[in-house]
Swiss-Prot record:
Protein name: Large ribosomal subunit protein uL24
Lineage, broadest ranks: Bacteria, Bacillati, Cyanobacteriota, Cyanophyceae, Synechococcales
Gene: rplX
Disulfide bond residue pairs: none
InterPro entries: KOW, Rib_uL2_dom2, Ribosomal_uL24, Ribosomal_uL24_CS, Ribosomal_uL24_KOW, Translation_prot_SH3-like_sf
Assembly behavior: Part of the 50S ribosomal subunit.
Protein's job: One of two assembly initiator proteins, it binds directly to the 5'-end of the 23S rRNA, where it nucleates assembly of the 50S subunit. One of the proteins that surrounds the polypeptide exit tunnel on the outside of the subunit.
GO biological process: translation
Organism: Prochlorococcus marinus (strain NATL1A)
An annotated GO cellular component: ribonucleoprotein complex
GO molecular function: rRNA binding; structural constituent of ribosome
């Protein structure tokens, strides 16, 4: 995949089936098996920010005189292919399918359970 530069428009944003507020499960990497809520999606980078997942410590220098430096722990984005939407009712992760409802609106549902997401 080519480098993505949002300002120059060299690549389009990637269509993502995961949205802010969804509960997801990590399927690969150091946090495999953990679940969390999506705080933010980054469609130009195909990444998601998940609460409590992929936490890293960052050393912050003092910005003003008289202030001390500190160590912050915060979440960093992970690739969208490393997460799957998680059903809290059935306790299972599943792929998402988009279908057109009887009234003509697009809906998302889990392939394994058939549970509607929205």
């Amino acid at each position: 995949m080519a480098a993505i530069n949002k300002t120059k428009g060299s690549a389009d944003r990637i269509k993502m089936k995961i949205r802010k507020g969804d509960t997801v499960q990590v399927i690969s990497g150091k946090d495999k098996g953990k679940t969390g809520e999506v705080l933010k999606t980054l469609p130009y980078e195909n990444r998601v920010l998940v609460q409590g997942i992929n936490q890293r410590t960052k050393h912050v220098k003092p910005s003003q005189e008289g202030e001390t430096g500190r160590i912050e722990t915060k979440e960093f984005p992970l690739h969208a292919s490393n997460v799957m939407i998680y059903s809290t009712k059935e306790k299972v992760a599943s792929k998402v399918e988009i279908f057109v409802d009887k009234d003509g609106s697009k809906k998302r549902r889990l392939k394994k359970t058939g549970e509607l997401i929205d």
